[in-house]
């Protein structure tokens, strides 16, 4: 556990990556849903 890559722990990188992926998917679905709703 002591050998961290550089200065950033691996769990922080995983957490940030997961949040970014979930955020992008949420924005994509929200954009498509609101786009379909506004077109009707």
Curated annotation (Swiss-Prot):
Transmembrane segments: 8-28
GO cellular component: chloroplast thylakoid membrane; photosystem II reaction center
Entry superkingdom: Eukaryota
Keyword match Thylakoid: yes
Keywords of this entry: Chloroplast, Membrane, Photosynthesis, Photosystem II, Plastid, Reaction center, Thylakoid, Transmembrane, Transmembrane helix
Any single biological process term in GO: photosynthesis
Main location: plastid
A Pfam family recorded for this sequence: PsbJ
Protein location: Plastid, Chloroplast thylakoid membrane
Membrane topology (UniProt): Single-pass membrane protein
Subunit structure: PSII is composed of 1 copy each of membrane proteins PsbA, PsbB, PsbC, PsbD, PsbE, PsbF, PsbH, PsbI, PsbJ, PsbK, PsbL, PsbM, PsbT, PsbX, PsbY, PsbZ, Psb30/Ycf12, at least 3 peripheral proteins of the oxygen-evolving complex and a large number of cofactors. It forms dimeric complexes.
NCBIfam families on file: PRK02565.1
Function: One of the components of the core complex of photosystem II (PSII). PSII is a light-driven water:plastoquinone oxidoreductase that uses light energy to abstract electrons from H(2)O, generating O(2) and a proton gradient subsequently used for ATP formation. It consists of a core antenna complex that captures photons, and an electron transfer chain that converts photonic excitation into a charge separation.
Entry similarity comment: Belongs to the PsbJ family.
Protein name in UniProt: Photosystem II reaction center protein J
Lineage: Eukaryota, Viridiplantae, Streptophyta, Embryophyta, Tracheophyta
